Amino acid sequence: MTLGIDEAGRGCLVGSLFVAGVVCGEKIALDFLKMGLKDSKKLSQNKRFFLEDKIKSHDEVKFCVIKKSAGEIDSLSLGVCLKLAVQEILEKLSPLAQTINIDGNTAFGLNKRYSNLKTIIKGDEKIAQIAMASVLAKTSKDREMLELHALFKEYGWDKNCGYGTKKHIEAIAKLGATPFHRHSFALKNNWFS
């Protein structure tokens, strides 16, 4: 069994960071690849929601999604929030896995405790379990941003998902930040001056 871990929302200016972990065997992973699984950024939103449902409802797939709010990111830092979320996933799911793969190049020092942990750059393109985790993290972020968009339509979050697009930055300059913005990001980039 392999545990794959990935995140969504790391570079967003607004909303939460979501980190997901998925554990399953290689046969199940292959079944998901046959369903069209790949890096969530390369899937349509409808396909992501379809795959999310299949992942969450599969008897032989175990998963965990951790949410870190904008407030937590502002008070603790993005890096600390990422590490805490990954630790929480490892505590819950690592006993089920022989191999642990994290997307990216940072193990947050956790490979000292988990000797079977590997970081894989572009892992969501190479390891099915990471791609499955990518789907769960991204659909969680998508859902949050659609809910927030209903409250603050002017920022275009239904399209930009909270990333720093031209329209989003112009809306911050014109309307100011919302309570859901990561104020540490906005201050760093002088959006309030």
Swiss-Prot record:
Catalytic activity: Endonucleolytic cleavage to 5'-phosphomonoester
Biological processes per GO annotation: DNA replication, removal of RNA primer; mismatch repair
Gene Ontology molecular function terms on file: manganese ion binding; RNA binding; RNA-DNA hybrid ribonuclease activity
Keyword Nuclease: yes
UniProt EC number: 3.1.26.4
Keywords, alphabetical: Cytoplasm, Endonuclease, Hydrolase, Manganese, Metal-binding, Nuclease
Subcellular localization(s) per the UniProt record: Cytoplasm
Binding-site positions, a divalent metal cation: D6, E7, D103
Needed co-factor(s): Mn(2+); Mg(2+)
PROSITE patterns named among the record's database cross-references: RNASE_H_2
Entry keyword Cytoplasm: yes
Role this protein plays: Endonuclease that specifically degrades the RNA of RNA-DNA hybrids.
HAMAP family given in the database record: RNase_HII_B
Name of this protein: Ribonuclease HII
Gene that this polypeptide is encoded by: rnhB
